[in-house]
Design a protein with these regions (language model features):
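Short glycine/proline- and aromatic-enriched beta-strand/turn motifs that initiate or cap beta-hairpins
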Residues: 22-108
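Short loop/turn motifs that connect adjacent beta-strands in outer-membrane beta-barrel proteins
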Residues: 23-25, 55-66, 118-123, 167-173, ...
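Residues on the lipid-exposed face of transmembrane beta-strands in outer-membrane beta-barrel proteins
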Residues: 59, 70, 109, 114-122, ...
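Residues that define the transmembrane beta-barrel architecture of outer-membrane proteins
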Residues: 64, 108-112, 152-158, 188-196, ...
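Transmembrane beta-strands of outer-membrane beta-barrel proteins
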Residues: 66-71, 126-128, 171-175, 196, ...
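Transmembrane beta-strands of outer-membrane beta-barrel pores
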Residues: 72-78, 130-136, 166-170, 177-185, ...
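Outer-membrane beta-barrel translocator domains and adjoining extracellular loop/strand segments
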Residues: 80-87, 137-145, 180, 184-191, ...
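Outer-membrane beta-barrel transmembrane domain signature
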Residues: 180-310
Length: 343
């Protein structure tokens, strides 16, 4: 079963790639006092972030302004189908939500993205997302017939995001938000999603080198999706092997129980499926659809760690658990200070 149900969930799986970075660091440990005192005396030479000089004067060690990350992200997520409308060969679509029953729908993804970012302010980071990947979607149909399929797809993703970061004593906070689109050829238009995450953590600095540090955190992740997906797919893409083991009498009995408008569309599709199973070419037969869906659980917990080797290189990892979503992220970030101020 290719397209109609499976492709609708591809976009959900690349939308969770978020950006996160600590904007500022400070420590009361007397071991680091000479280092932070030197920051207070330094004339911050770079254009960005804005207010960077003031941050140094207050003793905050801020990241270099410009960065680029390579990110690997994998996720498993459950999807709930709320309603479905179907048409055939351009006919008016009819609501079959009360007559088709889906079982569990589970999507697994592997995504690879590049994320350029800029600290505009010591506490404000903006970034872009561009990448792609693959996903495996498991869809099961319970009624009118039992049917399961596993499909694999490729998709491209792009988006924009913003992170607010700060600290309260030894505890740092980061609030990340992004709006992401996933483009799959089989879907009429890119699928948007809004992602938000809040992290609370602590940074442990190297005893001898303040620019080295280990950060750990916990938090919560939230995702909101565009509910409706609309498109049109060839019947042979949706049911490439339909007819092998399927009983058309059962489908006829089911369609006989439908209201007239729904029965007309269902019989048209069943007729085409039966012709296809008998070897008749049905390449021009298309199914139009309008699907409403949602993530089964919009919230899940996240736990992560970050090791800063120096001011240039940062390695970050994060694990998402609980809810009906699990995820793992690995992020390597490289940073440069950027342009100096004109004297």
């Amino acid at each position: 079963m290719r397209g109609l149900f499976a492709v609708l969930f591809v976009g959900l799986l690349f939308c969770s790639v978020t950006g996160f970075g600590q904007g500022m660091g400070m420590s009361d440990n007397p071991i680091y006092k000479p280092y932070y005192d030197s920051l207070k005396q330094m004339n911050y030479p770079y254009k960005l972030p804005i207010l960077g000089k003031q941050a140094y004067k207050r003793g905050y060690d801020i990241q270099y302004a410009y960065g680029i990350s390579g990110i690997y992200f994998t996720q498993r997520q459950d999807i709930d189908i709320q309603s479905i409308q179907i048409g055939f060969n351009g006919s008016q679509m009819v609501d079959l939500s009360n007559f088709i029953k889906f079982g569990p729908t589970v999507a697994n993804t592997n995504a690879y993205t590049v994320r350029p970012d800029i600290w505009l302010l010591p506490f404000l980071n903006v970034y872009g997302i561009i990448g792609g990947g693959t996903t495996e979607t498991n869809v099961s149909l319970i009624e009118p017939v039992g049917f399961e399929t596993v499909q694999n797809f490729k998709a491209d993703s792009y988006g924009l995001g913003v992170t607010l970061a700060g600290a309260v004593g030894p505890i740092f906070l980061a609030w990340d938000n992004n709006y992401n689109f996933v483009d799959v050829e089989a879907i009429v238009e890119p699928m948007p999603a809004f992602n938000s995450s809040l992290r609370v953590g602590h940074t442990i600095m190297s005893p001898s080198k303040p620019q080295k540090s280990l950060s750990v955190w916990g938090g919560v992740f939230y995702q909101s999706l565009q509910n409706d997906t609309k498109g049109s797919l060839n019947l042979t893409e949706i049911f490439p092997d339909f007819g092998n083991g399927f009983v058309f009498d059962s489908l006829r009995d089911w369609s006989a129980t439908l209201p007239p408008a729904q029965r007309l569309v269902a019989n048209q599709i069943i007729d085409a499926l039966e012709e296809m199973s008998n070897g008749v070419n049905v390449e021009n037969a298309t199914v139009d659809y309008l699907l409403e869906k949602k993530v089964a659980a919009p919230f899940n917990l996240i736990f992560g760690a970050q090791y800063q080797f120096n001011k240039h290189w940062i390695l970050r990892t994060e694990l998402g658990v609980f809810g009906k979503r699990s995820q793992f992220l690995l992020n390597l970030n490289y940073r440069i200070p950027g342009l100096k101020k004109v004297r």
